[in-house]
Amino acid sequence: MVTETPLEKPLDIGEIPLPAMEKRATEVAILLKTLAHPARLMLACTLAQGEFSVGELEAKLDIRQPTLSQQLGVLREAGIVDTRREAKQIFYRLAEDKAARLIEALYAIFCAPEENL
C-alpha cells in the first residue's frame, strides 16, 4: 500500500496581497508556459541533475542539434538556463532556483520509479 505524504497547507489566499498574488501568478504562468513543451521539459529535467554540454544533451536526450539549439534558446531567453563557454563548447545549467524546485517536484510526481510494496 502506498502512503501519500500530505502536502503542507498553503497560505490562506487572504494572507497574500492581491497585487503580489497577481505578480506571482504571472511569473508562474510564464515559467509553466515555457516548460510546456516536451523537449524543453526533458532538457530542464536533465539540467536539474547538473551542467551539460550541448553534445552531452544531444546524446543523452536523442534530440537533434537544430531542435536542441532552438529549445535551449527559448529556455535561455526566458532566464531558465545559463550558459558557460569553455573553448568551443557551451555548457548549460538551470539558472533559476524556482525552476529547479519545480522540475524536482514534477520529477518526484511523474518520473520517479514507483516502489514495489
UniProtKB/Swiss-Prot annotation:
Q: Which residues bind DNA?
A: 54-77
Instruction: Cite the entry's keywords alphabetically.
Output: DNA-binding, Repressor, Transcription, Transcription regulation
User: One Pfam match, by short name?
Assistant: HTH_5
Give the observed phenotype of the deletion mutant. Answer: Cells show altered biofilm formation; on glass surfaces and on tobacco root surfaces, it exhibits a greater biofilm mass than the wild-type.
Q: Which GO terms describe its molecular function?
A: DNA binding; DNA-binding transcription factor activity
Q: Which domain of life is it from?
A: Bacteria
- What range(s) does the HTH arsR-type domain occupy? 20-114
Q: Could you confirm whether the keyword tRNA processing appears in this record?
A: no
Q: List the disulfide bonds.
A: none
Q: Which InterPro entries match?
A: ArsR-like_HTH, HTH_ArsR_DNA-bd_dom, Metal_resp_trans_reg, WH-like_DNA-bd_sf, WH_DNA-bd_sf
What is the documented function of this protein?
A: Represses an operon that comprises at least itself and blh. Binds to a palindromic AT-rich sequence spanning the -10 region of the blh promoter and blocks transcription of the operon.
Name-wise, this protein is Biofilm growth-associated repressor
Q: Which gene encodes it?
A: bigR
